[in-house]
């Protein structure tokens, strides 16, 4: 564990990302621990500048190991990773002043207050002007909602409060890149919403945010781009809209709102719709992958059979649908 900002049969690999202006770029990045455990396997990843990038996968999929290599905390077995155009870990001294990071939870001095912890972190930055330290610390506390608890000893903080304090430490100075590993871990729903709002504000100010999470809701609500890992390998990456769009064509789920669900089920079944689920006033089903009926013709068939159609169309595809369709695996959804 380190303080914020401190150095310290599987699917085929995803396609190598194209060159360009990236805040973080990995090529063939691999980490094998002693004993042969392969934690990250030939990872090719590109995080565009200005994006809010969601790094998604089940616990143990290699996300944190990837972040630790990117931040220079551990060396890769093979492959390369660049952060803000600098090779890591060689460029760590040039890169870290431009990066805020919260990895595996903050390392705090339990005997110090929240405010004094931030003072210590700020004093450790050789570029920080001591004359404006108090203002920076106060602004960081205010931004994460810890002003009222600033005088309390850190050991008395809840897990969620410690997460907030670690995030405040990462925000003591303006950063080009903010790396957050499970930033809402331990927070209540209100705290989660506040952190997500803060991430959006930082992105609006021009900060690239790299957000690791196992919560689909978290990625879907705040991210512009996403990548998903499983068992140390990258399965897919792209914009959130692209991933959802790919799943939409794969799933083809139809939804009909009607007060006549039984009749709707009968007609839809006759036209090849499968996996039909009927509720009080709604029917959903899967359109066939091949020779699917035209949606307009299907709607006309329902109306022609006397079914009162109130709404008709494809369901909105969530990021959960996208990743299940693309990877065949589920993730935690609630956030």
Identify the residue ranges that each predicted region occupies.
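Residue-level "edge-of-site" marker
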Residues: 154, 281, 315
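ABC transporter nucleotide-binding domains
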Residues: 21-26, 31-230, 236
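C-terminal coupling/interaction segments
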Residues: 2-9, 290-335
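ABC-family P-loop ATPase nucleotide-binding domain
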Residues: 1-32, 329-335
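A generic structural signal for secondary-structure junctions
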Residues: 100, 123-126, 245-249, 269, ...
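ABC transporter nucleotide-binding domain
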Residues: 196-289
């Amino acid at each position: 564990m380190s303080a914020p900002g401190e150095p310290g049969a599987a699917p085929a690999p995803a396609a190598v990302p194209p060159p360009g202006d990236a805040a973080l770029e990995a090529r063939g990045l691999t980490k094998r621990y002693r004993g042969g455990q392969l934690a990250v396997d030939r990872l090719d990843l590109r995080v565009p500048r200005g994006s809010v990038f969601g790094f998604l996968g089940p616990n143990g999929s290699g996300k944190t190991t990837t972040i630790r290599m990117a931040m220079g905390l551990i060396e890769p077995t093979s492959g390369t990773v660049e952060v803000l155009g600098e090779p890591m870990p060689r460029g760590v001294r040039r890169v870290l002043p431009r990066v805020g990071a919260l990895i595996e939870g903050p390392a705090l001095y339990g005997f110090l207050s929240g405010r004094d912890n931030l003072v210590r972190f700020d004093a450790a930055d050789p570029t920080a002007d001591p004359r404006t330290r108090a203002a920076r610390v106060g602004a960081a506390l205010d931004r994460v909602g810890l002003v009222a608890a600033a005088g309390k000893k850190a050991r008395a903080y809840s897990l969620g409060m410690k997460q907030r304090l670690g995030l405040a430490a990462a925000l003591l100075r303006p950063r080009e890149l903010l790396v957050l590993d499970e930033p809402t871990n331990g927070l209540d729903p209100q705290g989660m919403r506040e952190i997500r709002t803060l991430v959006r504000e930082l992105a609006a100010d021009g900060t690239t945010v790299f957000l690791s999470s196992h919560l689909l809701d978290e990625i879907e609500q705040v991210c512009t781009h996403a990548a998903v890992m499983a068992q140390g390998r990258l399965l897919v990456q792209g914009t959130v809209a692209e991933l959802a769009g790919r799943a939409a064509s794969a799933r083809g789920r139809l939804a009909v709102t009607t007060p006549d669900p039984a009749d709707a089920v009968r007609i839809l079944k006759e036209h090849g719709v499968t996996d039909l689920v009927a509720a009080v006033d709604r029917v959903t089903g899967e359109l066939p992958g091949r020779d699917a009926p035209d949606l307009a013709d299907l709607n006309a068939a329902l109306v022609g059979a006397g079914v009162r159609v109130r709404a008709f169309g494809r369901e909105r595809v969530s990021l959960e649908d996208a990743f299940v369709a693309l990877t065949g695996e589920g993730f935690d959804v609630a956030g």
